[in-house]
């Protein structure tokens, strides 16, 4: 079968990243691939990334969650709800990771996530997160079990980790470290897509780490499908260089630029039908075109920048070569 050539993204721009969020621009993509790639990444980011969470809790003197503890401000159910919101990050990459954390305190005291005794390799991202408050002379001893997992796991499924011990309360666990994902697709020159994806995490990992992990998960799944056939149709991915991207833009007709009627008519009356013909003009020559004012000229410059073509820099380069060619002719 004849080789099929697809454009492969050569540019991924990371903007506005902080410890809990990041925005990424991926381009160029074949027409329609912005939605295809964006939707696949979003689904995996929200459902399939591994994380660490509390799976059960044991509080000294407590046998079940529907009770109160003398000298403790919150009831057991509220304490459990507060525990679910603690964000953990661990260095251990093994799937069977398990760690027990203890919190031993005496009142009066306000307990937060930082009140836990942490072993090496375990970090709490939100140490100021509130758990409960103890009154005078109250002793409080709590043990929680940390496990790794994916997505959401209900308390019923977490009971296996409690080993049927009396007083061990299984709780719901939200393992996924990604809080929100949104994306948008813009159409660019050359009938290409530009994908912008924004990721917010709980702080357990950076947005770029989440994006890379999601992409890796997708690749691993697709590789299994590729292996179904020993002789798949060969698909060649072509990574366009910036020079090639410029060349593809230069071949476009001005009708494809989605210009205002006034600007379009001005260029047409001047006999300018393609982007290649347009960039051969100097800025002064463009401004002097009939019925084309500075507002239209600014629109033209903005349009070039919008589609990733540095109009001024490229124009100077073209003019320089044109001058050199004229000198050679004379």
Curated annotation (Swiss-Prot):
Domain of life: Bacteria
Enzyme Commission no: 2.7.7.6
The entry's keywords: DNA-directed RNA polymerase, Nucleotidyltransferase, Transcription, Transferase
Positions of the UniProt region annotated as Alpha C-terminal domain (alpha-CTD): 245-330
Ranges where the record places region Alpha N-terminal domain (alpha-NTD): 1-229
GO CC annotations on file: cytoplasm; DNA-directed RNA polymerase complex
GO terms for biological process, alphabetical: DNA-templated transcription
SUPFAM superfamilies: C-terminal domain of RNA polymerase alpha subunit, Insert subdomain of RNA polymerase alpha subunit, RBP11-like subunits of RNA polymerase
InterPro entries assigned: DNA-dir_RNA_pol_insert (IPR011262), DNA-dir_RNA_pol_RpoA/D/Rpb3 (IPR011263), DNA-dir_RpoA (IPR011773), RBP11-like (IPR036603), RNAP_asu_C (IPR011260), RNApol_insert_sf (IPR036643)
UniProt keyword Transmembrane present: no
NCBIfam families: PRK05182.2-5, rpoA
Record function comment: DNA-dependent RNA polymerase catalyzes the transcription of DNA into RNA using the four ribonucleoside triphosphates as substrates.
Subunit field text: Homodimer. The RNAP catalytic core consists of 2 alpha, 1 beta, 1 beta' and 1 omega subunit. When a sigma factor is associated with the core the holoenzyme is formed, which can initiate transcription.
Record's comment describing the protein's domains: The N-terminal domain is essential for RNAP assembly and basal transcription, whereas the C-terminal domain is involved in interaction with transcriptional regulators and with upstream promoter elements.
Membership in a protein family: Belongs to the RNA polymerase alpha chain family.
Descriptive protein name: DNA-directed RNA polymerase subunit alpha
Lineage of origin: Bacteria, Bacillati, Mycoplasmatota, Mollicutes, Acholeplasmatales
């Amino acid at each position: 079968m004849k080789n099929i050539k697809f454009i492969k993204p050569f540019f991924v721009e990371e903007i506005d990243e902080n410890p809990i969020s990041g925005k990424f621009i991926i381009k160029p993509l074949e027409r329609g691939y912005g939605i295809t790639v964006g939707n696949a990444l979003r689904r995996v980011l929200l459902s399939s990334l591994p994380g660490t969470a509390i799976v059960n809790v044991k509080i000294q003197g407590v046998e079940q969650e529907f009770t109160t503890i003398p000298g403790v401000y919150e009831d057991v159910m509220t304490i459990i709800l507060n525990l679910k919101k603690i964000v953990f990050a661990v260095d251990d990459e093994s799937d069977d990771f398990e760690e027990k954390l203890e919190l031993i305190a005496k009142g009066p005291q306000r307990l937060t996530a930082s009140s836990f005794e942490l072993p090496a390799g375990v970090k709490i991202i939100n140490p100021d997160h509130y758990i409960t408050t103890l009154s005078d002379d109250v002793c409080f001893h709590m043990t929680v079990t940390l496990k790794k997992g994916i997505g959401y796991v209900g308390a019923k499924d977490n009971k296996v980790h409690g080993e049927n011990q009396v007083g061990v309360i299984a709780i719901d666990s939200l393992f996924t470290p990604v809080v929100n994902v949104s994306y948008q697709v813009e159409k660019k020159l050359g009938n290409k897509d530009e994908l912008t994806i924004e990721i917010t995490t709980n702080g357990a990992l950076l947005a770029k780490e989440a994006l890379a992990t999601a992409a890796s998960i997708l690749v691993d799944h697709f590789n299994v499908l590729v292996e179904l056939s020993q002789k798949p149709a060969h698909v060649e991915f072509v990574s366009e260089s910036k020079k090639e991207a410029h060349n593809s833009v230069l071949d476009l007709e001005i009708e494809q630029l989605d210009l205002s009627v006034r600007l379009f008519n001005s260029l047409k009356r001047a006999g300018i039908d393609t982007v290649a013909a347009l960039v051969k003009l100097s800025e002064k020559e463009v401004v002097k075109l009939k019925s084309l004012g500075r507002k239209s000229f600014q629109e033209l410059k903005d349009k070039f920048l919008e589609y990733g073509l540095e109009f001024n820099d490229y124009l100077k380069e073209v003019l320089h070569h044109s001058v050199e060619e004229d000198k050679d002719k004379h």
